[in-house]
Amino acid sequence: MNPFYNHSMHNWTKSLSKVEKINLGRYGLSPVITLRGVIIDWDFLRAYIRLWDPEVHVFRFGAMMEEMCPLFEEFCPIIGCDLNAPLVKHEVKIGYIRSFETLFQFSRPQARAMIVDDQKAILLPLIDEFSEACPNDPDRMRLRMRALVFCLLAGFLFNQDPGFGDLRLCPMVRQMEDMGCIGGIVLAETIRSLDRAALGFDDWTVSVTSLPGPPVNPNEPSRDATNCSIVIEKDPLLRFG
């Protein structure tokens, strides 16, 4: 994990004003800030992966093999999104660089300076650009909120490449700005990652509804508070339909 990125996000979220925290509710991510300090319990993590049945996507436990599965209605409040809102969908399209420019009102040179391989944005310069609040400039504050949401999505909910943000997240930020619900995508990717972990694949990651976590090696426990409790597949965006 990039310690500079982690530190920058920590400072940014600490600096949010009361109004900005309230405005995060529009995107359905308010609890993400609240859960920043959660420390992963590795024993619990390993235990619930052993209880997961990847065939039917449920936890099985007890002598009677009771079943429990993550429910959309229970999952959305954890993230903070409205389960009755229209679902955020992944838009398969070309021109994601243009989406990045438009989302943050960057010039082409500005955007290009932050983009790697035409596919992902380096998050540190994006944080540097928007981490300073400008309360007297509403347009700038709106772009700052978009940047924060983009970084939270890239570094927490879809953290397959810590320190970078997939450009395919840009259309999702716009849908969330219109109060779309991200819970369906996050739940689907959580289940897929649980499946991969239970089947023994090593390319699954953990993250805490907040800051990014590195790829997990179950044989090397860590108490890093920037890791966390929701399991996400390493490259979730590849499977959106």
Regions found by a protein language model. Give the residues of each.
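N-terminal leader regions that mediate targeting or early regulatory function
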Residues: M1-F201
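Extended, charge-rich alpha-helical regions
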Residues: I115-E132, N136, R140, L211-G241
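Compositionally biased, low-complexity segments enriched in small residues
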Residues: N2-Y5, M9, T205, S222, ...
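Extended alpha-helical, oligomerization-prone segments that build pores/tubes and scaffolds
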Residues: D202-W204, P214
